[in-house]
């Protein structure tokens, strides 16, 4: 489903996502005009690329919960050296957490890995491969 994500930052930014890929970036007005039938998600916070988690994953009772802890932080990728445990790597794959060696970027054609951050730096929402995987209540 085609979805446009917008943040509340200045200058305004909108990212159009179709499936798991970014199809357009620009001002909310430009992107909405290009995709008038798209669903629009308006987020309160700064929309940008997800974070690359540089260190070991947070401790939690299960591998799934360790990966989910990253999603709550706005991380959309982790380094391979921190995913060597088979259960942890499997949980990362099931959740589409990217294994990266550099921070993700927002560009047309790239995988839609986005995050929205509030003014205090806390994560409002995380999108992995076009799918909303975390939303703060």
What are these regions (language model features)?
Residues 1-34, 99, 105-106, 110-119, ...:
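N-terminal metal-binding scaffold of metallo-dependent hydrolase/deaminase domains
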Residues 28, 57, 82-85:
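Short, ordered loop/turn segments at secondary-structure junctions
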Residues 80-105:
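Active-site loop-helix segments enriched in His/Asp/Glu that coordinate
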Residues 73-77:
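Short acidic/polar active-site loop segments enriched in Thr and Asp
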Residues 68-71, 107:
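Alpha-helical segments flanking ligand/cofactor-binding loops in enzyme cores
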Residues 38-40, 125-132:
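Short, compositionally biased
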